Amino acid sequence: MQKVLVVMDMQKDVVDGALGSAQAQLIVDNVRQKIENFDGPIIFTRDTHDTDYLESQEGKFLPVTHCVKNTEGWHIVPGLIEAAEGRPIMSPVSFIDKPNFGSFELLSRLEGMNSVNPIESITLVGLCTDICVVSNAIILKAGLPEIPVYVDSSCCAGVTEESHQAALTTMKMCQCIVE
């Protein structure tokens, strides 16, 4: 049995760039510590857009160019990948580039991992609680209903504190375990 950690969108543009916030910056150390102490595979997701982002439906609702592939703001904030790769255990570290909030690729990857070595639990951390974290938590609960999905609230931040709390409540109602 294995436990899996999913680190959602801890990218420069989402932490302290175009979409950054003080709340996002405050969780970076917590996320780093969670990674350093995690005994199992870690998957980093990256919000990934093209230069025509503003023409997309998401871009029309959120007209702030961010996380354009291979730009400085698209990269994971310093220290997190290094923390994952520097762990004393030899568990894999992988990446998923996702073009929108929820990722069916993440679900598919976890289903594949589960078929090879059963997953005991999945833990989600990262940004933004009220957009990508909640979207993926619900997808994972729907696709892997018998695997506990944990959300470490000390390692998440929302667009606002109110929307962060609302997302945590929503995930609890959908049988995610919010810590």
Describe the residue ranges of each PLM region.
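Catalytic cysteine-centered active loop of the rhodanese-like fold, especially the PTP/DSP P-loop
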Residues: 96, 117-142
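Active-site rim beta-loop-alpha module in soluble metabolic enzymes
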Residues: 93, 97-98, 104
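Short amphipathic alpha-helix with an adjacent loop that forms part of the alpha/beta core around
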Residues: 107-117
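Short, well-ordered secondary-structure micro-motifs
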Residues: 54-56, 106-109, 135-136, 162-163
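A short glycine-rich beta-strand->turn/loop micro-motif centered on a GG-aromatic cluster
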Residues: 122-130, 148-161
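Histidine-anchored nucleotide/phosphate-binding helix
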Residues: 30-37, 134-144
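Short acidic-hydrophobic, aromatic-tinged amphipathic segments that line or gate anion-handling sites
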Residues: 96-97, 177-179
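Active-site acidic carboxylates
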Residues: 1-95, 116, 150, 159, ...
